């Protein structure tokens, strides 16, 4: 679907998911992440870039596991994360749009939990490449976890947290031969409806990840 068509559908409130490809498992248990792989940090920084051309090849679970752990996994026994959040609110949820369905990343159990048995990839952005890339991440702020943050500042605080997660994804991608791009030109209402979000949840950004084309 072209960008222009998607934008027109979005303006009409008609940007919809596609049927899932294959079975939508209620959960996907991820293997333990490899915390010793990838490039050294300075080399990954040197290779960090945005890419908008993706192969359709599926990422193996082992690589998806490392990607999600690097993005926002737990890296301390007390539940600390790989990306910061103000007052440790941990208000960001990472959703993963796959051909088989949309999942929420559960960092505590390091697994994916099904939230929608549809292929939501084309809903995650107006760009045409999001439809066929193997996965699209969506960063959602849950304002109900931000009671200690003034209401008027919650979106700003959460956006900073989402940006830190996105940079983790960039560095993991650079260090593991993947392509990625962060995206803010998205239909937030369509994404929220497709994911079944509540009024306390706010869609912030999307990020496409895959092998370079």
Enumerate the predicted regions with their spans.
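Solvent-exposed coil/turn segments that connect beta secondary-structure elements
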Residues: 99-101, 142, 212
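Glycine-centered structural positions embedded in regular secondary structure
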Residues: 8-13, 163, 207-210
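N-terminal amphipathic, basic helical "cap/leader" segment at the start of enzyme domains
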Residues: 1-133
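Short, surface-exposed helix-loop/turn micro-motifs enriched in polar/charged residues
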Residues: 86, 180-183, 199
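A glycine-rich helix N-cap at a beta->alpha junction
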Residues: 196-213
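Small-aliphatic-rich amphipathic alpha-helix that forms the alpha element of a beta-alpha
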Residues: 48, 67, 94, 137-191
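Short coil/turn connectors at secondary-structure junctions
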Residues: 131-135, 200-201
């Amino acid at each position: 679907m072209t960008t222009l068509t998607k934008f027109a559908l979005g303006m009409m409130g008609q940007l919809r998911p596609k049927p899932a490809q294959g079975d939508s498992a209620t959960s996907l248990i991820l293997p333990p992440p490899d915390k010793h792989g990838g490039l050294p940090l300075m080399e990954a920084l040197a290779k960090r870039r945005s890419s908008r051309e993706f192969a359709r090849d599926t990422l193996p679970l082992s690589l998806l596991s490392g990607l999600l752990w690097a993005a926002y996994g737990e890296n301390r026994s007390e539940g600390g994360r790989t990306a910061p959040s103000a007052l440790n609110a941990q208000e960001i949820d990472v959703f993963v749009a796959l051909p088989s369905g949309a999942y929420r990343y559960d960092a505590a159990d390091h697994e994916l939990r099904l939230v929608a048995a549809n292929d939501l990839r084309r809903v995650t952005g107006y760009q045409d490449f999001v439809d066929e890339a193997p996965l699209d991440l969506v960063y959602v702020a849950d304002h109900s976890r931000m009671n200690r943050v003034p209401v008027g500042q919650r979106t700003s605080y959460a956006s900073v947290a989402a940006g830190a997660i996105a940079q983790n994804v960039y560095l993991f991608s650079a260090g593991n031969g993947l392509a990625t791009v962060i995206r803010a030109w998205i239909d937030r209402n369509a994404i929220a409806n497709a994911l079944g979000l509540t009024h306390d949840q706010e869609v912030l950004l999307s990020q496409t990840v895959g092998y370079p084309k």
